[in-house]
Design a protein with these regions (language model features):
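Charge-rich, low-complexity segments
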Residues: 1-56, 148, 156-191
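Extracellular-facing segments of soluble proteins and assemblies that are Gly/Ser/Thr-biased and enriched
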Residues: 77-108
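Extracellular/secreted glycoprotein ectodomains characterized by long, lumenal stretches
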Residues: 69, 95-107, 114-117, 144-145
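Short, flexible loop/turn elements at secondary-structure junctions
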Residues: 51, 93-95, 142
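Generic detector of well-ordered alpha-helical segments enriched in charged/polar residues
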Residues: 5, 19-22, 56-63, 100, ...
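A glycine-rich, hydrophobic loop/mini-helix early in the fold
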Residues: 33-88
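Helix-rich interaction surfaces within compact, conserved domain-sized segments
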Residues: 111-185
Length: 191
């Protein structure tokens, strides 16, 4: 199917979501060594909830998978529905590789069940030396990452200087969204 997809789709991109997500497996080390950002051990996947039996079955499949694979990936998980109606699957683990495998598998399950259009983002949390949170967000629709650094205690203000620093640091390692107007802020993240 992928072969014919090259001819049918105008914007064919051979990289799957999993390929792009796993590009973070080395980039997180660069963030730590060059600008001191450490993986917090938390990430989340967000998707728009819809009512219906098949969506509920998909949620149960995700929970079953995560329950079974807890020991393999050394992950804890929880789900939260936010005030906008988005379902968040939140993963916690010590190793970035486990987080990436878990979030990729959850995304693949959603895709296999036919709900890929509901996917919003995968969010990876980092902390700096002052324990301030910074995020790298993967936009499923754009197949790219972008930084998000909220300013603590402010009324929804971003630290664009820190965002640009993150982008410059890993720009050669992961596909980054070049159009900054598409760097959507995700306020009040449930991480």
């Amino acid at each position: 199917m992928r072969f014919f997809g090259k001819f049918i789709k105008r914007n064919y991109d051979p990289k799957t979501d999993s390929d792009v997500l796993f590009s973070l497996s080395s980039a997180y080390l660069t963030l730590e060594s060059k600008i001191g950002l450490k993986n917090s051990g938390r990430c989340a996947l967000s998707l728009k909830s819809i009512s219906g039996m098949y969506f509920n079955e998909m949620k149960e499949d995700i929970k079953r998978f995560l329950d079974i694979s807890k020991t393999d990936f050394e992950l804890a998980y929880r789900t939260v529905t936010d005030s906008y109606g988005y379902l968040w699957v939140i993963l916690e683990g010590k190793r970035m590789e486990d987080l990436l495998a878990g979030i990729s598998a959850v995304g693949d399950t959603i895709d296999e069940k036919g709900f890929s259009n509901q996917l919003l983002a995968a969010v990876f949390e980092f902390t700096n030396d002052r324990n301030k949170k910074q995020y790298l967000i993967y936009n499923y629709k754009r197949n790219s990452f972008y930084p998000f650094v909220p300013v603590d205690g402010s009324q929804k203000t971003r630290n664009t200087e820190e965002e640009m620093k993150m982008m410059a640091t890993i720009g050669d390692e992961v596909p980054l969204e070049k159009d900054m107007t598409l760097w959507y802020p995700l306020w009040d993240l449930p991480l």
